[in-house]
């Protein structure tokens, strides 16, 4: 018997006798283009949802802080001063006017930060009402249009 010139056990499909499988460069490029198109459609929608979620978290935090401040006022017949700030809800203020009926564990466990990593602010008296509780918003600057406060919680 004569062996073929290709050698023992070899054929046109490779050494193992099976056809080699895989994706061509063109197929891989088509998949990458499709993924890019899908990403360009989805990412802008997700970014808009993040902004809405951040705003909603700030609104929720401000409403919670308002409730805690109302409890503070019920116990002490006044809100904390601007100088005492929202920290007066966590620990008893030592700055005048000191509260007379302050609970041992405060009114809240800890102060939340707004979604942009900034502390919420308290103004007493407020510029928009009796008391202003607000976030400086995404830009972190006071007095700008993106501030979120208890005076504009319904704004979208």
Swiss-Prot record:
Where is it located? Cell inner membrane
Q: Tell me which UniProt keywords the record has, alphabetically.
A: Cell inner membrane, Cell membrane, Membrane, Methylation, Protein transport, Transmembrane, Transmembrane helix, Transport
GO cellular component terms, semicolon-separated:
plasma membrane; type II protein secretion system complex
Q: Which InterPro entries match?
A: Bac_GSPG_pilin (IPR000983), N_methyl_site (IPR012902), Pilin-like (IPR045584), T2SS_protein-GspG_C (IPR013545), T4P/T2SS_Core (IPR050470), Type2_sec_GspG (IPR010054)
Keyword check for Ribosomal protein: no
Point out the propeptide residues.
Answer: 1-22
Modification sites for N-methylphenylalanine? 23
Instruction: State the SUPFAM superfamilies in the record.
Output: Pili subunits
Q: Name one GO biological process term.
A: protein secretion by the type II secretion system
Modification after translation (UniProt) = Cleaved by the prepilin peptidase. Methylated by prepilin peptidase at the amino group of the N-terminal phenylalanine once the leader sequence is cleaved.
Predominant location category: membrane
Subunit structure comment from the entry: Type II secretion system is composed of four main components: the outer membrane complex, the inner membrane complex, the cytoplasmic secretion ATPase and the periplasm-spanning pseudopilus. Forms homomultimers.
As for what it does, the entry says:
Core component of the type II secretion system required for the energy-dependent secretion of extracellular factors such as proteases and toxins from the periplasm. Pseudopilin (pilin-like) protein that polymerizes to form the pseudopilus. Further polymerization triggers pseudopilus growth.
Q: Which family does it belong to?
A: Belongs to the GSP G family.
Query: What is the name listed in the Swiss-Prot or TrEMBL entry for this protein?
Result: Type II secretion system core protein G
> What is the taxonomic lineage of the source species?
Bacteria, Pseudomonadati, Pseudomonadota, Gammaproteobacteria, Enterobacterales
């Amino acid at each position: 018997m004569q062996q073929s010139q290709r050698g023992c056990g070899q054929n046109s499909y490779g050494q193992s006798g099976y056809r080699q499988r895989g994706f061509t460069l063109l197929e891989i490029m088509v998949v990458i283009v499709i993924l890019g198109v899908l990403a360009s459609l989805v990412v802008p929608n997700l970014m808009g949802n993040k902004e809405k979620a951040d705003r909603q978290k700030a609104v929720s935090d401000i409403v919670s802080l308002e409730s805690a401040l109302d409890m503070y006022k019920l116990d002490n017949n006044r809100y904390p001063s601007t100088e005492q700030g929202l920290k007066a809800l966590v620990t008893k203020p030592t700055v005048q006017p000191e509260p007379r009926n302050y609970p041992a564990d405060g009114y809240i466990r800890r102060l939340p930060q707004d979604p942009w990593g900034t502390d919420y602010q308290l103004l007493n008296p407020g510029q928009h009402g009796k008391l202003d509780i607000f976030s400086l918003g995404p830009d972190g600057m006071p007095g700008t249009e993106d501030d979120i406060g208890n005076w504009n919680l319904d704004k979208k």
